[in-house]
Amino acid sequence: MSNAALATAPHALELDVHPVAGRIGAEIRGVKLSPDLDAATVEAIQAALVRHKVIFFRGQTHLDDQSQEGFAKLLGEPVAHPTVPVVDGTRYLLQLDGAQGQRANSWHTDVTFVEAYPKASILRSVVAPASGGDTVWANTAAAYQELPEPLRELADKLWAVHSNEYDYASLKPDIDPAKLERHRKVFTSTVYETEHPVVRVHPISGERALQLGHFVKRIKGYSLADSQHLFAVLQGHVTRLENTVRWRWEAGDVAIWDNRATQHYAVDDYGTQPRIVRRVTLAGEVPVGVDGQLSRTTRKG
C-alpha cells in the first residue's frame, strides 16, 4: 500500500488500542507479534504507529532474537547500526545493557547523524529492573504545532548539523570513564556529520516535526552561543511533559516508535539492577524539509 493510502485509508481490522497519554502513545492488546503475523494486522499496526507515534505490546515473552528480526521484516527493511556491532548470531539486533554503561539517558532520535536514518525502531525488553528504568517518548510533531507562529516560521528555515562525535562525558558524567571511552571508540569508529532540516515533513502523514536531539552539533548559520540558545528553545518544546508518554517496562514488552516524529529518553534511575533491551531499526527515507530540500551527509570517515 502506498504512503498516501496508508495515511488515509480505513482499515478493516480494528485493533484493541488503548491510548496511554493524551498526545502520544498507545498500548495494543490481543496481538501476538511474530514473523507469521497476517497482512491485515500488520497494516493496522503500521497505521496505529503513524497515528500514535509509539505503540506498546505487553507480554511478548515468546519472542527471541530471530523472531524479533523476522517480525521486523514485516514492517520494513531491517538495518544494523552503522558503527556498533550486532548481537552474536543476529544480523540486525543492537543490545543496550545498563551494566555496561549503555544507558541512553539523554533526549535523542535514533541515528540522526546519518542521511537516511531509521524510520522506526522495535525495542524488546529482555531483562527489566524491579523498579526504575522507564523510557519516555516525546511527540516532535505536536511540539512543532504548539510553537508560536513566528517561531514556526523560523524553524522552517533552519538546518542543523548532526554528528555521532560529541561530548559524551558531559552527557554521562556518572559512567565509569573507562567504560565510557570504550563505548565512544566503538560509537565513533566512523565519524558522521549530516545536515538535516530542523523541520522535516513526514512522508506518510504529511505532518511537520522538529528534528533535533542530542546528535545536533550546531545550527547552521549561527554562532555557537546563538545556536545553543536556539536549540534549547526548540528542544524545550519537544520535551514538555504534555508532549510525552512514559512506559514502565516488564520483561517481554515490545515498543515500536516512529523515529521520524519522536525523541526518546531512557531514564537512568535503576542503579545496579540489570536492564537489557534489544533493538531492531528499519531503513528510513532521506528527510525532506519544508522547502523540499533533502538532508545531506557532509562527512563520513
Curated annotation (Swiss-Prot):
Strongly stimulated by ascorbate. Substrate binds at residues 81, 111. One of its GO terms (cellular component) is cytoplasm. Coiled coil: none annotated. Disulfide bonds: none annotated. Its cofactor is Fe(2+). It catalyses: a primary linear alkyl sulfate ester + 2-oxoglutarate + O2 = an aldehyde + sulfate + succinate + CO2 + H(+); 2-ethylhexyl sulfate + 2-oxoglutarate + O2 = 2-ethylhexanal + sulfate + succinate + CO2 + H(+); decyl sulfate + 2-oxoglutarate + O2 = decanal + sulfate + succinate + CO2 + H(+); hexyl sulfate + 2-oxoglutarate + O2 = hexanal + sulfate + succinate + CO2 + H(+). 2-oxoglutarate binds at residues 135, 275, 279. Its EC number is 1.14.11.77. Fe cation binds at residues 108, 110, 264. Optimum pH is 7. It comes from the Bacteria. One of its GO terms (molecular function) is 2-oxoglutarate-dependent dioxygenase activity. It holds the Pfam family TauD. Keywords: Dioxygenase, Iron, Metal-binding, Oxidoreductase. Catalyzes the oxygenolytic cleavage of 2-ethylhexyl sulfate (2-EHS) in the presence of alpha-ketoglutarate to yield 2-ethyl-hexanal and succinate, the decarboxylated form of alpha-ketoglutarate. It can accept a wide range of alpha-keto acids including 2-oxo-valerate, 2-oxo-adipate, 2-oxo-octanoate, 3-methyl-2-oxo-butyrate, oxaloacetate-alpha-ketoadipate, and alpha-ketooctanoate. It can catalyze the cleavage of medium-chain alkyl sulfate esters such as butylsulfate, pentylsulfate, hexylsulfate, heptylsulfate, octylsulfate, nonylsulfate, decylsulfate and sodium dodecyl sulfate (SDS). Belongs to the TfdA dioxygenase family. Homotetramer. This is Alpha-ketoglutarate-dependent sulfate ester dioxygenase. It comes from Pseudomonas putida.
